[in-house]
């Protein structure tokens, strides 16, 4: 049957990508339908019970800055919070949280069920409605046809998923859930380039059978307890609990090696490539043969369950081998496994077939987000989902697509990497992937993106008001520090030395003094009995005041580095956004090698910047493209001229 209501946007899948996509489109005022095979699994954490980490936490902050749900849901469900790399520079500091699976999922579902313009429907999708070269809807397993002006696919590991435990395997999207076999077949009919990847998960352990007395506790940060969202508060957090640490040993490794002849990875049963930076335990033992021990973190799955997640023991070995390797580790000698570990193979679709908006180049109105694009991780999925939802909404509204630049957001780095370079293994975000990471910090994600989010329609009034209060406070106090001057007459050496290490010899602004190593905003404000402190607190809420202080201190201390990076962005960006026509005939560009012509024709980059990052495209080739565009050929279709270009 044809459903009687036509929607603006349909989102297929209710994981981390799908939920953010649906919420974003609905916040923009689009009539949105989220189709999921099971409403009870909306927002489910399929693998590890944690959010964030290096690079990943940055993405979560960006999703939050654009009004997304992940950070606030983590604040409501987080049972341990830590700042990683806290002793290092601000660019690589990252928030990580352990989450109670039940509380996190409940927080996401609550937002979905109470979001205006968003409807939910429980049915697996088996087909897409395509008319000409455009998608116009989706068909569920019982034949219900839903029509829409845009469709966002966020199918995760469900597309033709196959689960492996030892040499046994069966179809499934994840343990306990069916695979999306028909939908995968339909996408293949559309001739979209695709491949196979794999990921895995460890066995889960009954905490009642763990001997914690011999294990090392790893508590979270307690003074202060971090929050994830820019709107987060510590009183949102449930009870905080520790993780625990154990280690593999030579016996563990011997057990694994002896079982490799029954491993689907090492017997050729699994064809998909797994994530390099989250390897299975058998892969670790093989790749790092010289190491006699690996650290394993025992992470609680929640406050109302005894289930523990042994982070670092992802495996698809046979169950008897899993049991032996778990029992070989200290504190786990008598552990009971609640769920076996497994590997899962699934289809992904080459992200080089997507525009920067995450819309398919081949099928109009069809957007892809999450693991279907070859990424791994909740955070990468959520960020893509948010962007796909925004761009689906913009398309419905007849507006131009939006994608952040590489110098503007980790989300921009993620998308640009995917659409220009593609993937040969599951893609994970790291701070090292960003050229401009000093400007792309967790602490300033709101300063980078919230105003854009407001213009796009995904940032509500409460977030916008909070952002403006923070931005104004940072600006006001920064200007005060720059305009408040001290000299030796009013700041004697005896008062200066405890804070500055020595007396001052000339006039300085407070901002000048704050730039010095080991001088903090707090110590500066305490100088001479608080003489230089602001008349009023930076904010009424202590947490907000701390965020403002951090922004001020980083902005002043790293001003020179950030300014140099901004100059580099401007220099490199002169031709970054110069458009390349969709029907560009690269054979007409004199001097381009056949290899370069073929690669450009295959990838169809939208801009000079994208073209420059395709493997094998040399700076000389980019120069030839620019010369060709400046000549105004291609039947009058040229990219926008940069400043100073001839007419």
Swiss-Prot record:
InterPro entries registered for this protein in UniProt: FAD/NAD-bd_sf, GIDA_C_N, MnmG, MnmG-rel, MnmG-rel_CS, MnmG_C, MnmG_C_subdom, MnmG_C_subdom_sf
Cofactor: FAD
Residues annotated as transmembrane: none
Keywords linked to the UniProt accession: Cytoplasm, FAD, Flavoprotein, NAD, tRNA processing
BP term (GO), one: tRNA methylation
Keyword tRNA processing: yes
Family listed: Belongs to the MnmG family.
HAMAP family the record matches: MnmG_GidA (MF_00129)
Protein name: tRNA uridine 5-carboxymethylaminomethyl modification enzyme MnmG
Native organism taxonomy: Bacteria, Pseudomonadati, Pseudomonadota, Betaproteobacteria, Burkholderiales
Gene of this entry: mnmG
């Amino acid at each position: 049957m044809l459903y009687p209501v036509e929607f603006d946007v349909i989102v297929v899948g209710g994981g981390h990508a799908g939920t953010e996509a649906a919420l974003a489109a609905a916040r923009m005022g689009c009539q949105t339908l989220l189709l999921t095979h099971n409403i009870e699994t909306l927002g489910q954490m399929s693998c590890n019970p944690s959010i964030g980490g290096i690079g990943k936490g940055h993405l979560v902050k960006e999703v939050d800055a654009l009004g997304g749900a992940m950070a606030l849901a983590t604040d409501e469900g987080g049972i341990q919070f830590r700042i990683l790399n806290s002793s290092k520079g601000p660019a690589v500091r990252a928030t990580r949280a352990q989450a109670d699976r039940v509380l996190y999922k409940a927080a996401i579902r609550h937002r979905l069920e109470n979001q205006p313009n968003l409807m939910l429907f429980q049915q697996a999708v088996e087909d897409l409605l395509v008319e000409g070269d455009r998608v116009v809807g989706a068909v569920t397993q019982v034949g219900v046809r839903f029509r829409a002006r845009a469709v966002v696919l966020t199918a995760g590991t469900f597309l033709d998923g196959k689960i492996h435990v030892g040499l046994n395997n069966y179809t499934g999207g994840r343990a306990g859930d069916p695979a999306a076999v028909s939908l995968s077949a339909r996408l293949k009919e559309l001739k979209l380039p695709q491949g196979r990847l794999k990921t895995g998960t460890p066995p889960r352990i009954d905490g009642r059978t763990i001997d914690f007395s011999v294990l090392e506790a790893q508590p979270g940060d307690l003074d202060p307890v971090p929050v994830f969202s820019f709107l987060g508060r510590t009183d949102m957090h449930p009870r905080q609990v520790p993780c625990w640490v154990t280690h593999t040993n030579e016996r563990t490794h011997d057990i694994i090696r002896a079982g490799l002849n029954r491993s689907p990875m090492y017997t050729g049963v699994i064809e998909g490539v797994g994530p390099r930076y989250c390897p299975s335990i058998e892969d670790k033992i093989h790749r790092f043969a010289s190491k006699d021990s690996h650290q394993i973190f025992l992470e609680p799955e929640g406050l109302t369950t005894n289930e523990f997640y042994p982070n670092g023991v992802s495996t698809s070995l046979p169950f008897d081998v899993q049991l032996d390797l778990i029992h070989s580790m200290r504190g786990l000698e008598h552990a009971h496994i609640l769920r076996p570990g497994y590997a899962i193979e699934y289809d992904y679709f080459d992200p080089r077939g997507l525009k920067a908006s995450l819309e398919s180049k081949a099928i109009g109105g069809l957007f892809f987000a999450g693991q279907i694009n070859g990424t791994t991780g909740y955070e990468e999925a959520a960020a893509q989902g948010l962007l796909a939802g925004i761009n689906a909404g913009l398309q419905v509204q007849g507006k131009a697509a939006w994608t952040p630049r590489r110098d503007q957001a980790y989300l921009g780095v993620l998308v640009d990497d995917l659409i220009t370079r593609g993937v040969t293994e599951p893609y994970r975000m790291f701070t090292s992937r960003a050229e401009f990471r000093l400007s792309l910090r967790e602490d300033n994600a709101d300063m980078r993106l919230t105003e854009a989010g407001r213009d796009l329609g995904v940032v509500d009034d409460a977030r916008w008001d909070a952002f403006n209060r923070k931005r104004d406070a940072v600006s006001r106090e920064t200007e005060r520090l720059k305009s408040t001057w001290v000299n030796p007459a009013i700041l004697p050496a005896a008062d200066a030395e405890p804070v500055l290490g020595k007396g001052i010899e000339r006039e300085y602004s407070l901002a000048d003094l704050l730039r010095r190593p080991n001088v903090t905003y707090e110590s500066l404000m305490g100088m001479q009995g608080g003489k230089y402190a602001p008349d009023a607190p930076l904010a009424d809420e202590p947490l907000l005041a701390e965020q403002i202080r951090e922004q001020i201190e980083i902005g002043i201390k790293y001003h020179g580095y950030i300014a140099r990076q901004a100059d580099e962005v401007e220099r490199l960006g002169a031709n970054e956004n110069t458009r390349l026509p969709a029907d560009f005939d690269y054979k007409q560009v004199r001097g381009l090698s056949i290899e370069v012509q073929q690669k450009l024709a295959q990838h169809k980059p939208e801009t000079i910047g994208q073209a420059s990052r395709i493997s094998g495209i040399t700076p000389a080739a980019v120069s030839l493209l620019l010369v060709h565009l400046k000549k105004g050929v291609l039947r009058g279709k040229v990219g926008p001229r940069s400043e100073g270009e001839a007419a």
